[in-house]
From Swiss-Prot:
One of the protein's GO biological processes: urea catabolic process
Upper taxonomic lineage: Bacteria, Pseudomonadati, Pseudomonadota, Gammaproteobacteria, Enterobacterales
The protein's role, per its UniProt record: Facilitates the functional incorporation of the urease nickel metallocenter. This process requires GTP hydrolysis, probably effectuated by UreG. Expression of the urease operon increases the likelihood of bacterial survival by contributing to acid resistance in vitro and in vivo in BALB/c mice. Y.enterocolitica enters the body via an oral path and must survive the acidic stomach before being able to colonize the intestinal mucosa.
Location within or outside the cell: Cytoplasm
GO molecular function: GTP binding; GTPase activity; nickel cation binding
GO CC annotations on file: cytoplasm
Domain of life of the native organism: Bacteria
The name this protein goes by in its record: Urease accessory protein UreG
Organism: Yersinia enterocolitica
Length: 221
């Protein structure tokens, strides 16, 4: 678990969502947000890009009518986004504090950022917990490569499982390798297109990050 910050101004649970470019981080946010809202969570979203706010624009388009676009903020880091969430998170901390002040009734902030392959982690000054997203298209061997992000994340998401047959990847092997490198740390397999694993991912967020009672599968309102 990422160490909690001692910043007394922090009011809202902060979750980092990181992973390699193209792994599906933005898609994960887009599919879990409506479910979180349905379950009574009031989320805010911050995305990180080097010289654009394209991810934020994409999320705003996808979540139009679901989440007020003012609750989605893009940060232009001017450098590798992983630096802005790990070595020097001051820009993101400022963005978080701005959002907390503007929307004090919110109870969750998701901070999305890409990183250098498997090395991305989030500063404990920025995120209380973080999720790391990899995808099957990167290859069956990805879990065996370890990397701080993959190994230390509070939840590992293995995304795009529908692509396994097309890239010759065995999900059984990926799961087995994941258990070896992560030990007892949780992981989940997901498919954003079909929704496979998404409700379960939200259950994990609710239970382990927000410390909220989770109803058994099939009983969600």
């Amino acid at each position: 678990m990422n160490s909690h910050s001692t910043d007394k101004r922090k009011k809202i649970t902060r979750i980092g969502i990181g992973g390699p470019v193209g792994s599906g981080k933005t898609a994960i946010i887009e599919v879990i947000t409506p479910i979180l809202i349905k379950r009574g969570i009031k989320p805010l979203i911050i995305t990180n890009d080097i010289v654009t706010t394209e991810d934020a624009k994409q999320v705003k388009r996808t979540l139009k009518g679901i989440l007020d676009e003012e609750k989605i903020l893009g940060v232009e880091t001017g450098a590798c986004p992983h630096t802005a969430v790990r070595e020097d998170p001051s820009m993101n901390i400022a963005a978080v504090e701005e959002m907390e002040e503007r929307f004090p009734d919110s109870n969750l902030i998701m901070i999305e950022s890409g990183g250098d392959n498997l090395t991305l982690t989030f500063s404990p000054a920025l995120a209380d917990f973080y999720i790391y997203v990899i995808d099957v298209a990167e290859g069956e061997k990805i879990p065996r490569k370890n990397g701080p992000g993959l190994v230390q994340a509070d939840i590992l998401v293995i995304n795009k499982i529908d692509l396994a047959p097309y890239v010759g990847a065995s999900l059984d092997v990926m799961e087995s390798d994941t258990k070896v490198v992560r030990g007892e740390r949780p992981y989940i397999l997901t498919n954003c297109k079909t929704g496979q694993g998404i409700e379960e991912l939200v259950d994990m967020i609710m239970r382990d990050f927000l410390f909220t009672h989770v109803q058994p599968q099939g009983e969600h309102a």
